[in-house]
Amino acid sequence: MVVIRLARGGSKHRPFYNVIVTDSRSRRDGRFIERVGFYNPVANEKQERVRLNADRLNHWIAQGAQVSDSVAKLIKEQKAV
């Protein structure tokens, strides 16, 4: 099954997440099919906090990809889909 979820990056105490499309059996930060955005929870006012590619999200959801709870919150916040 294909899922859309967050993959953690960044450094200690400075998380940065990529919104990725991946197989549900792969590891959190392992192989992925496509990167469709990012989420920076510690962004300041000069930096972008969330960016999502709505076209690609809609494509993968139409193909049957399941969206994780955390990504669903980001989508709702951005009103991307």
Curated annotation (Swiss-Prot):
InterPro entries: Ribosomal_bS16, Ribosomal_bS16_dom_sf. SUPFAM superfamilies: Ribosomal protein S16. GO terms for cellular component: cytoplasm; small ribosomal subunit. Signal peptide: none annotated. One of its GO terms (molecular function) is structural constituent of ribosome. Coiled coil: none annotated. One of its GO terms (biological process) is translation. Keywords: Ribonucleoprotein, Ribosomal protein. Belongs to the bacterial ribosomal protein bS16 family. This is Small ribosomal subunit protein bS16. It comes from Neisseria gonorrhoeae (strain ATCC 700825 / FA 1090).
